[in-house]
Amino acid sequence: MQEKDVSSHGFLPRFQHFATQAIHAGQEPEQWASKAVVPPISLSTTFKQEAPGQHSGFEYSRSGNPTXNCLEKAVAVLDGAKYSLAFASGLAATVTITHLLKAGXQIISMDDVYGGTNRYFRQVAAEFGLKISFVDCSKSKLLEAAITPETKLVWIETPTNPILKMIDIEACAQIVHKHGDIILVVDNTFMSAYFQRPLALGADICMYSATKYMNGHSDVVMGLVSLNSETLHSRLRFLQNSLGAVPSPIDCYLCNRGLKTLQVRMEKHFENGMAVAQFLESHPLVEKVIYPGLPSHPQHELAKRQCTGCPGMISFYIKGSLHHAETFLKSLKLFTLAESLGGYESLAELPAIMTHSSVPKSDREVLGIRDTLIRLSVGLEDKQDLMDDLDQALKAAHPTNASHN
């Protein structure tokens, strides 16, 4: 169920009861002898058994932890899923998912993906006998043409990182599931559970780098996976226990706490992101702005059909050269020059040199990851302060053209 929101800019209505579920799901005080309202941090690595092989739900913290269990139950509800698993990082989740495959199987990955995902597929997974194909999955015909009898997994991000292409999840699911037992994975990191529910659109697995919006405070490294298949869940749980890709109880506690403000944070990210995107689009020192919330985005209508809003992720091309981009980034005062995204603080980075430097230069050029492409993670500060900071940094990068206003 979804509820109407007059400030949604034409996007889908917000998911009903989201804030209530984020605060209460999996947090029931009755599960603790102390009736604690806030789930405690369970640091114990092992748990007493009543008799050999008879435990009360937990035996060893790698295979299950009470604090992680609270987080997983909450995330499952927010994703509209039956199951959720917390991992030590987003890449730990990615590695575990690919272990569902055997050597010789093919992974089709969206060509524009997080640099770490690209690096893992290209330089690690391929070395273990997996066939990797990078395809523009925003074009259904290209995805269809890339599928072979060896295809076992399709991996997409929407919006993509850093070019912010939107992919029609439902269309991808229809194509993928025509071909038998292929798993469709959607990296939902940029949108978070608040703005997009991939499982409801046909994805088999929804995954996150929870380091970003889901936690939202830049103090946790974690991955999350949500799904509805009991078979896939059992297999992933086994693989996670076997590979050891588990998060610490403290990180689970922090991420669980971060979920409680996910709704209010994402609404503010949307408000600030839209304001900054509109400001940049009208700025004479900016060549082009990429933001799915803007009508100028080539897949704006798809974004409105598929999502309930947009996060604070904006990419734009500054006019000039690498020198101008670097000067701009070094001149920022409120935006911090740093990798990562999705925290309450605003960040800026240069993908070609930072997050996507491991992507081959020839591929970067084809994708549009040029030396003048800047990625912003717009935080929760006062939006006018953010726009003022961007304006002064743009003028610093182009001092001879700074007299435009």
UniProtKB/Swiss-Prot annotation:
The processes (GO biological process) annotated in the record are: cysteine biosynthetic process; cysteine biosynthetic process via cystathionine; hydrogen sulfide biosynthetic process; lipid metabolic process; negative regulation of apoptotic process; positive regulation of canonical NF-kappaB signal transduction; positive regulation of NF-kappaB transcription factor activity; protein sulfhydration
Molecular function GO labels: calmodulin binding; cystathionine gamma-lyase activity; homocysteine desulfhydrase activity; L-cysteine desulfhydrase activity; L-cystine L-cysteine-lyase (deaminating); pyridoxal phosphate binding; selenocystathionine gamma-lyase activity
User: Any signal peptide, and if so, which residues?
Assistant: none
A cellular component term from Gene Ontology for this protein is:
cytoplasm
Q: In which pathway does it act?
A: Amino-acid biosynthesis; L-cysteine biosynthesis; L-cysteine from L-homocysteine and L-serine: step 2/2
Report which superkingdom the organism of origin falls in. Eukaryota
Q: Which residues carry this modification: N6-(pyridoxal phosphate)lysine?
A: 212
TM segment ranges: none
Main localization is: cytoplasm
> What is this enzyme's catalytic activity, as reactions?
L,L-cystathionine + H2O = 2-oxobutanoate + L-cysteine + NH4(+); L-cysteine + H2O = hydrogen sulfide + pyruvate + NH4(+) + H(+); L-homocysteine + H2O = 2-oxobutanoate + hydrogen sulfide + NH4(+) + H(+); L-homoserine = 2-oxobutanoate + NH4(+)
Annotated PROSITE patterns = CYS_MET_METAB_PP
Q: Which cofactor does it need?
A: pyridoxal 5'-phosphate
Localization terms from the record: Cytoplasm
Amino-acid biosynthesis keyword on record? yes
Annotated Pfam families = Cys_Met_Meta_PP (PF01053)
Which InterPro entries does this one have?
A: Cys/Met-Metab_PyrdxlP-dep_enz (IPR000277), Cys_met_metab_PP (IPR054542), PyrdxlP-dep_Trfase (IPR015424), PyrdxlP-dep_Trfase_major (IPR015421), PyrdxlP-dep_Trfase_small (IPR015422)
Q: Which SUPFAM superfamilies match?
A: PLP-dependent transferases (SSF53383)
Supply the alphabetized keyword list: Amino-acid biosynthesis, Calmodulin-binding, Cysteine biosynthesis, Cytoplasm, Lipid metabolism, Lyase, Pyridoxal phosphate
Annotated function: Catalyzes the last step in the trans-sulfuration pathway from L-methionine to L-cysteine in a pyridoxal-5'-phosphate (PLP)-dependent manner, which consists on cleaving the L,L-cystathionine molecule into L-cysteine, ammonia and 2-oxobutanoate. Part of the L-cysteine derived from the trans-sulfuration pathway is utilized for biosynthesis of the ubiquitous antioxidant glutathione. Besides its role in the conversion of L-cystathionine into L-cysteine, it utilizes L-cysteine and L-homocysteine as substrates (at much lower rates than L,L-cystathionine) to produce hydrogen sulfide (H2S).
Could you tell me what this protein is called? Answer: Cystathionine gamma-lyase
Organism for this UniProt entry = Sus scrofa (Pig)
